[in-house]
Amino acid sequence: MSSVLQKLITPLASSSAEPPRNKVTVVGVGQVGMACAVSILLRDLCDELALVDVMEDRLKGEMMDLQHGLLFLKTSKVVADKDYAVTANSRLVVVTAGVRQQEGESRLNLVQRNVNVFKCIIPQIIKYSPNCTILVVSNPVDVLTYVTWKLSGLPKHRVIGSGTNLDSARFRYMMAERLGIHASAFNGWVLGEHGDTSVPVWSGANVAGVSLQKLNPEIGTDGDKEQWKATHKAVVDSAYEVIKLKGYTNWAIGFSVADLTESIVKNLSRVHPVSTMVKDMFGIGEEVFLSLPCVLNGSGVGSVVNMTLTDAEVAQLKKSADTLWGIQKDLKDL
């Protein structure tokens, strides 16, 4: 006796369906991971979304919650499992998993614990999606992007850190608020480390091509009477402030990751400040990952824009690199 399905559907194709072309995997279903996942879904950036985590109940719950809303989205398939086989054929893998810093813990110890976590994650990603691009979001992101590159064996252009894409967005928002314009109307970049030693490029800050440094040669310096430098300090402090108020940050980084995802899966060749291998650039001699203006396309980081920086800005960038290398050089088991 024929089933309802057999009566309803007459198959025409003899072969099974093609594998997904724009499959995105998010590793880690915490606050940041789910903000990334939802942002990617809302922008219709994948034809399949896979979620992976070690916490099976939370993972299944998040998967079901998203699946129940698929009617309202254009992505047809959301899957999840602790087994990385579910990630097979991913075009992009977003890594948000990692351990949190404990009170009084050194950054080196935090990174070393995350190295041990990543040693379980990265080889599994490569096993099932050898042609993927990896976007690292876990903090400290620049060092963990280096760790991912070393563990994955992928070429450097296919291992990217979310870097200062969010720092730059915060900078543009805060500067634009002070100027009374929309964030998209202010052009400004924050480079270097995602964190305390990030570098605001005051020499390039402009509105409609009008250089703010030409209007105020002291902008961003201690001698600036208008104290624009305080805006960058607010950028650096902003994550700490949000964490103090709500316990974590997730929405802005989720939007930022979706923005980067779009440039990669749609092959847009847009320029973003993301973490990439900077050895031999700006006089940096070590294998560190820092944020520079990168052209993101289907191959990952297609190229790096050779931004004109002042001597002071280059010195700050080198300081950023030294800070990161100070941690990286003592890492074990890489």
Curated annotation (Swiss-Prot):
PROSITE patterns: L_LDH. Keywords: Cytoplasm, NAD, Oxidoreductase. NAD(+) binds at residues 30-58, 100, 139. Gene3D superfamilies: Lactate dehydrogenase/glycoside hydrolase, family 4, C-terminal, NAD(P)-binding Rossmann-like Domain. It is found in: Cytoplasm. Pathway: Fermentation; pyruvate fermentation to lactate; (S)-lactate from pyruvate: step 1/1. Changing residue 112 to R: In strain: Isolate New Jersey 137A. It catalyses: (S)-lactate + NAD(+) = pyruvate + NADH + H(+). Its EC number is 1.1.1.27. GO terms for biological process: lactate metabolic process. NCBIfam families: L-LDH-NAD. Homotetramer. This is L-lactate dehydrogenase B chain. The lineage of its organism: Eukaryota, Metazoa, Chordata, Craniata, Vertebrata. The gene is ldhb.
